[in-house]
Regions:
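N-terminal alpha-helical targeting/anchoring segments
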Residues: 1-76, 90, 94
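TRNA-recognition modules of translation machinery and tRNA-sensing kinases, especially anticodon-binding
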Residues: 71-374
Length: 374
């Protein structure tokens, strides 16, 4: 033991031993540096390992191996060729992509007039249902997250290239615009031992989200499907680990209930192992019907992460046996507001390019029934 040898030498007055003491100190410094480097290397490897899929999850490579578990709603039949949301929006003079390209760049949009009102109505409608009917607590969170917060939910280090890092004060920690409110809402329990009686904790927030969409070059270049900035209503649940899968069913039902109320056709799929997100143990995607594409497109993703994020965030609770154990975390879109706007435009379009306002949204829009060019 080098430390013990060094201590023994310090009690001696022998010159040669003092020299040896210096050598031991140097050796200890080297070992300490090696240990730190090895730990950093190990941490980097471990932080890049994804969650383990739940046994329920089908094996597969990509979206082609996902499993449809539900189809709901009636796909509309038109006696004309349905237009895309961006054609409809531009013809109404209420979606302006060219102006956004001029002021900001590609993959941004100006939403104007009644469509801006419709976007806000959708967000408020979703929040009201989640708060009043589904028992979620509304939060208005910061839109900027620290590096540590992003690590906690699994966005970093693996997905650094997809994040918008912002320059803050010189010398301060790295900061990022949130890619989803999941990041900031889940971290509410970071470094905490929560009281078991407070579980489940259910939070909801409507926020802008910011993503570079790295790796999606050439995909969905037209319209609002894939934007760098978009609104999303996000649900987050903190539960006892044993209740994760039950909570996942509940959360997914909260999302599909909105589509039922909006009378939009959709399907629910369980993602295969190869298509799941980094932090998830099990994920349902909800896909809404888009007439212009003649197919279903993702409008919500609901995931159980079991204790994966909790271990990174050190979020725990004391169970019945007085043991301190990790919480389970879940997150889900309820719903992506921009994509819901797209679905309303396309499914409720009329031959003349006007849009019928869904009944449940009219109280949020001064009882407006039809959006048309004036």
């Amino acid at each position: 033991n080098l430390e013990k040898e060094k201590k023994d030498i310090s009690k001696s007055k022998d010159e040669s031993l003092f020299k040896k003491s210096k050598e031991i100190s140097s050796e200890l410094d080297k070992i300490s540096t090696q240990q730190k480097n090895t730990k950093t290397e190990l941490d980097n490897i471990l932080s890049g390992i994804p969650n383990i899929p739940h046994p329920d999850v089908p094996n597969g490579k990509d979206e082609n191996d996902n499993l449809e578990v539900l189809k709901a709603g009636k796909v509309p039949e038109f006696d004309f060729k349905p237009k895309s949301h961006y054609e409809l929006g531009e013809n109404l003079g209420m979606l302006d992509f060219d102006l956004a390209t001029k002021t900001t760049g590609s993959r941004f949009v100006f939403v104007k007039k009644e469509l801006a009102l419709l976007e806000r109505a959708l967000s408020n409608f979703m929040l009201d249902i989640h708060i009043v009917q589904n028992g979620y607590q509304e939060i208005s969170p910061p839109l900027i997250a620290s590096e540590n917060t992003m690590y906690g939910t699994g966005q970093l280090p693996k997905f650094e290239n997809d994040q918008f890092e912002i320059k803050f004060d010189e010398g301060s920690d790295r900061k990022y615009l949130i890619p989803t409110a999941e990041v900031i809402l889940t971290n509410i329990v970071k470094d905490k031992i929560v009281d078991q009686k407070d579980l489940p904790m259910r939070y909801v927030a409507s926020t802008p989200c910011f993503r570079k969409e790295a790796g999606s070059y050439g995909k969905d270049t037209k319209g609002m499907i894939r934007q760098h900035q978009f609104y999303k209503v996000e649900m987050v649940s903190i539960v006892e680990k044993e209740n994760c899968l039950e909570e996942l069913e509940r959360m997914t039902n909260c999302a599909t209930d909105l589509l039922d109320k909006l009378e939009l056709p959709y399907r629910k799929v369980i993602l295969c192992s190869g298509d799941m997100g980094f932090s998830a143990e099990k994920t349902y995607d909800i896909e809404v019907w888009l007439p212009s594409e003649n197919k279903y497109r993702e409008i919500s993703s609901c995931s159980s992460c079991s204790t994966f994020q909790a271990q990174r965030m050190k979020s725990r609770y004391k169970n019945k046996n007085k043991e301190t154990v990790f919480v389970g975390t879940l997150n889900g879109s309820g719903l992506a507001v921009g994509r819901t706007l797209i679905a309303v435009l396309e499914n409720y379009q009329q031959k003349d390019g006007s849009i019928i306002v869904p009944k449940v949204l009219r109280p949020y829009m001064n009882n407006l029934e039809l959006i048309s060019a004036k």
